[in-house]
Amino acid sequence: MAETENVREIRDENYQSLIPMDEYLAAGVHIGTQQKTEDMKKFIYRVRSDGLYVLDVQSTDERIRAAAKFLSRYDPANVLVVCARQYGQHPAEMFARAIGARHIVGRFIPGTLTNPVYMFFAEPDVVVVTDPIGDAQAVTEAISIGVPVVAMCDTNNMTSNIDLVIPTNNKGRKALALVYWLLAREVSRERNEQGFSYTVNDFESEI
């Protein structure tokens, strides 16, 4: 309970989040790593006694809203979702399915965005990645062709090549499921689409 109270005191007790703050905390969205970068410093609320950095979940909530507005402006067929990280692959695939986007999970083949002769060559208008470290090849190629990148970033990530950061635990199974589900729901709402029936459980990877 103390953790919940601490996070709620971050900036605005009257802030109306997309879901109850307790749900972010229960999924571990706020749990960072024992490393921090200067880039992510502004999204960090505090450091625990064990050296673990804690993310500001209000920033997470705000950035999910911003990312949903941003992504909703694109033709979903031209949105590419990428994830190499194990626990992010199913949520990323479900997110793509929910909004009508393309997805590449597992290994990202070099040249996917830059080599027109490659069988699975893709020309997206925007790329969503789960971790700028694990998905570094996709980020590099997106930058080289001038395509914006939306990324889920933990406390240890560099963000200089990211256009829109969603600060979150990008390693946890439940955290990734919640953030991808919520982002899908908000994109659907921004598009004024009806019938979004997915649940968080639909997005959660099996252990």
Swiss-Prot record:
GO MF term set: structural constituent of ribosome
Pfam families in UniProt: Ribosomal_S2
GO cellular component, one term: small ribosomal subunit
InterPro entries in UniProt: Ribosomal_uS2, Ribosomal_uS2_arc, Ribosomal_uS2_CS, Ribosomal_uS2_euk/arc, Ribosomal_uS2_flav_dom_sf
Superkingdom assignment: Archaea
Keyword entries, A-Z: Ribonucleoprotein, Ribosomal protein
KW Ribosomal protein (keyword) present: yes
GO biological process, one term: translation
NCBIfam families in the cross-refs: uS2_euk_arch
Protein family membership: Belongs to the universal ribosomal protein uS2 family.
Name of the protein described by the UniProt record: Small ribosomal subunit protein uS2
Organism per entry: Methanocella arvoryzae (strain DSM 22066 / NBRC 105507 / MRE50)
